[in-house]
Amino acid sequence: MTALPIRGPVRIIGIDPGLRRTGWGVIEAEGNRLIYVACGSVEPPDDLPLSSRLLAIHEGLASVLSDHKPMEAAVEQTFVNKDGVATLKLGQARGVAMLAPAMFGISVAEYAPNQVKKTVVGAGHADKQQIAMMLKILLPKAEPPSADAADALAIAITHAHHRQSTALRLKVVGV
């Protein structure tokens, strides 16, 4: 896996996994400076069987990774809800979202939804509108085509914010 550099610009992809729409957002971070690169979503047809939808997500993310060449990746963790089957299916999409960057040799960090909201908005229970408002401030050139792409940018921002402490922790333990 790619090491986490502490200095210099780093390109980060944030991924918001989902079976219907997997959002992705790419930014560059250097210190506190964030630069928007691109965002979008992978949307497999609903009528495909599960295995084909997962393949479409993988191929779509692989294309984004190849085109934008991020150095690090961050994926949102899945929260468990009352529908166990839906949670398991989302977990499969999340597995694909983690596998795709790993196949490119890119380290993958994970963040809880509340941590993403708290990092970007300042409140762990922020809504989609609050996230969108902060994205306009933090990444003024970004115009996410969907809430999933916006969430993916928020995940990338969260990683940019927390990666310094992660890199220092890894350095201390000798990784």
Curated annotation (Swiss-Prot):
- Chief location bin: cytoplasm
Q: What are the subcellular locations of this protein?
A: Cytoplasm
Cofactor: how and how many bound: Binds 2 Mg(2+) ion per subunit.
- The protein's Enzyme Commission number: 3.1.21.10
Determine if DNA-binding is one of this entry's keywords: yes
Please give the InterPro entries that the UniProt record associates with this protein: RNaseH-like_sf, RNaseH_sf, X-over_junc_endoDNase_Mg_BS, X-over_junc_endoDNase_RuvC
Pfam short name (any one) = RuvC
Q: Which UniProt keywords apply?
A: Cytoplasm, DNA damage, DNA recombination, DNA repair, DNA-binding, Endonuclease, Hydrolase, Magnesium, Metal-binding, Nuclease
Positions that bind Mg(2+) 2: 76
* One Gene Ontology term from the biological process aspect of the record: DNA recombination
Q: Name one GO cellular component term.
A: cytoplasm
Q: Does the keyword Translocase apply?
A: no
Q: What is this protein called?
A: Crossover junction endodeoxyribonuclease RuvC
